[in-house]
Amino acid sequence: MVEILRFIPLVLLLTLTWRITYELFFSPLRHIPGSLLARLSSKYSILKRVLSDGPQSVQADYQYYGNIYVHRPNGVSISHPDDIRTVLLSPEFRKTKVYEMLDIEGHASIFTTRDPAQASRRRRQIGPYLNHGYLGRMEGLIMKYSVLAIKRKWDRLLEESGGQQVTVNYRDHKQYATFDTIGALAFGREFNALTNDDRTVIRWIEATGLYLGIRKNFPLLKLWPFSRVLRQYRERYERFIAYSKESVTRRKNLLSTVGERPMDLLQAFIDAEDPENPHVKMTADEVMTESIAMQLAGSESTSFVTSWVIHLLTLYPQHLAKVTEEIRSQFSPSHLITFAECRDKLPYLEACVYETLRYSPITSGFLPRISYTKGLTIQGHYIPPGVEIAINLHGAHINKDVWTNPHLYDPTRFLGDDQAKRNVFAFSYGHRNCIGRNLAMMEIMIIIANILKEYDIALPEDSVHGPWNVDALGRPRIMPTRSALFTTPKYPERDCRLVVSRRQ
């Protein structure tokens, strides 16, 4: 036994030597730029994003290596919008197994399925309920839990402060509102997070994403005693699963006693049928999975985008003034602005949202795709079948071949330029774009429009980040972030404060 153990270092050394030799001289990706460590281990890229500033890390990779580089063994990252469209529009490319980590109790959602047939079937089932027409029928419910809830909260705080002004944490309030909204839509229940400043359900949802992600990337933590590290996250995950199952059961019991069906996403999921295979509906587990997926994917991303719009507008007061004037010149203070009115009458606001999606670090990761049957030539390099192709969103959004002065925050680049909008991939692209895109844009637009219509906003005098705090390029510094499933403010209690007063 001792003799065998003496050979272990030699075996490890020979294995490492072979891996390095293969990656540098024999791999089909050997001519593509990239770090040697990235070629040797997939954990290198993950740890680099988690331990450092994730968005800046992947931006730096694009700036150093260019439009294509190796970011993991048998995997490349691409950043040119034309290449990205080629991959996303090809039926040969599908999501990779990494999406398994967000499956719920073994069930893939429309956001995580790797099966093209299942993805198409689910789109046929629930896609009609997420178009502008059906969302318009749910807009009253969406308004109730987002715009009107924030208004009630801020008006109460202003009244308690004597009616002058009040400092709020806009990140918390936007997050509470979007979680309450998706909770009402996808579960048919009231979280009351914003009303009560209650983070209970939000902690369940945050723990769910964290628990599923860590289990996938660090499987050793599934085993005892290491599993104790994740115990609190597992318990919150299990509470969320139980809550979700209970929501489906409650709704089905309700339907047996009342005739009128509620107008929300939970009911849509229950009623959804595949037009190519009528009368086949989703099972209770599938309804639960889609409801949870909508909460995971929809609440966090929407609240973060909304918060980043506010953050960037306060850093660039000239754009805040323009978008506020656009809104107030067309709507009276008492008018509740709808999503249709936002789309028709507020092009500058829409431009600010698109520029936020391009400029801000909403996610620190990639969108990985793979084809097992089709090779592809990208930037002069042939990528054989079986190689993962990951879309570097940050590289695409600052790509010097596409954007003029990409390092600058400039919403005007989107005014009257539909091609610029097509070069933003925050919601993916084409027939495979995020199915919740319309809902997310509705929430973002109506919240920002109605807030700026009714309230004056400004930064507190002691804010660390503002127009005065600039970097070497003269740009206002954005608040520091931390990376998880999404990129969140690192110090929200310090950096997400806003002075709110009634419109003058």
Curated annotation (Swiss-Prot):
Q: What span is annotated as the signal peptide, if there is one? A: 1-23
In short, the EC number is 1.-.-.-
Q: Looking at the record's lineage, which domain of life comes first?
A: Eukaryota
A GO molecular function assigned to this protein is:
oxidoreductase activity, acting on paired donors, with incorporation or reduction of molecular oxygen
Look at the named UniProt entry and state the broad enzyme category this protein falls under.
Answer: oxidoreductase
Q: Which GO terms describe its biological process?
A: helvolic acid biosynthetic process; secondary metabolic process
**What are the disulfide bonds?**
none
Keyword terms: Heme, Iron, Metal-binding, Monooxygenase, Oxidoreductase, Signal
The cofactors named for this UniProt entry are: heme
Q: In which pathway does it act?
A: Mycotoxin biosynthesis
Provide the protein name. Cytochrome P450 monooxygenase helB4
Species lineage: Eukaryota, Fungi, Dikarya, Ascomycota, Pezizomycotina
